[in-house]
Amino acid sequence: MDVMNAFDSQAEDSPTSLGRSLRRRPLARKKLSEMVEEELEQMIRRHEFGEGEQLPSERELMAFFNVGRPSVREALAALKRKGLVQINNGERARVSRPSADTIISELSGMAKDFLTHPGGIAHFEQLRLFFESSLVRYAAEHATDEQIALLTKALEINSQSLDDNALFIRSDVEFHRVLAEIPGNPIFMAIHVALLDWLIAARPSVPDRELHEHNNLSYQQHIVIVDAIRQRDPDKADRALQTHLNSVSATWHALGKKSQKMR
């Protein structure tokens, strides 16, 4: 295959009617690194390079595409971000398969930007409510005894962290992570981890003393959720979860307003 033909394309003459209806403007030219990236991606997706197989060396890729080393390195870095290759120091890039974490990380920048828009946090809180509502209903119907034991252990750690806000936040995240693990779906896990990371990062900074009562309430609400799961009652578990997340949202909105007034 003559790869370079795609890199030397000529612009076609525009129809006269198009020229009359549109103002002339230059077409954006693709960078060489983007062209190399696209071609390598297509090769990988066509299985010309299999999973776990090493790509040609940088020097070989430079010669093959007739480009410089920076273009090759930029292309490989872009493929790494997409999860299509792994790059270890001193080794040639190796073809890999994108994971759920890779997919979510590609969305992370856009998600964090959206959170800064008016209503952005509320939209993500609603997404979390819909998502975890399904998780808790599934847990009430399908969680194994071992998985319920893990939830119980997470509750114990929760209770031991009430007087330390940083520890409580970690134990709170861990409790919800155990809940998200129950279906055994790696995409659920990746979404859940990212969603909590985005929401926690968007929360205002408040003194620890402001959170002690909130932490106690969250812990008590976690107990109700686990009890409903133990009872195999999805409706009760769902109600408990919604009460908990609505309470969390209300608390942080109130703390955020209070923090703004104090500035």
UniProtKB/Swiss-Prot annotation:
PROSITE patterns, per the entry: HTH_GNTR (PS50949)
GO terms for MF: DNA binding; DNA-binding transcription factor activity
GO biological process: negative regulation of DNA-templated transcription
SUPFAM superfamilies with a match to the protein in the record: GntR ligand-binding domain-like, Winged helix' DNA-binding domain
Region annotation Disordered: where it falls in the sequence: 1-25
DNA-binding span(s): 58-77
Keywords, in A-Z order: DNA-binding, Repressor, Transcription, Transcription regulation
Residues in HTH gntR-type domain copies: 30-98
InterPro entries cross-referenced by the UniProt entry: GntR_C (IPR011711), TF_FadR/GntR_C (IPR008920), Tscrpt_reg_HTH_GntR (IPR000524), Tscrpt_reg_NanR (IPR023730), WH-like_DNA-bd_sf (IPR036388), WH_DNA-bd_sf (IPR036390)
SMART domains: FCD, HTH_GNTR
Presence of keyword Transcription regulation: yes
Role summary: Transcriptional repressor that controls expression of the genes required for the catabolism of sialic acids.
Family: Belongs to the NanR family.
Protein name stated in the entry: HTH-type transcriptional repressor NanR
UniProt source species: Salmonella schwarzengrund (strain CVM19633)
Lineage: Bacteria, Pseudomonadati, Pseudomonadota, Gammaproteobacteria, Enterobacterales
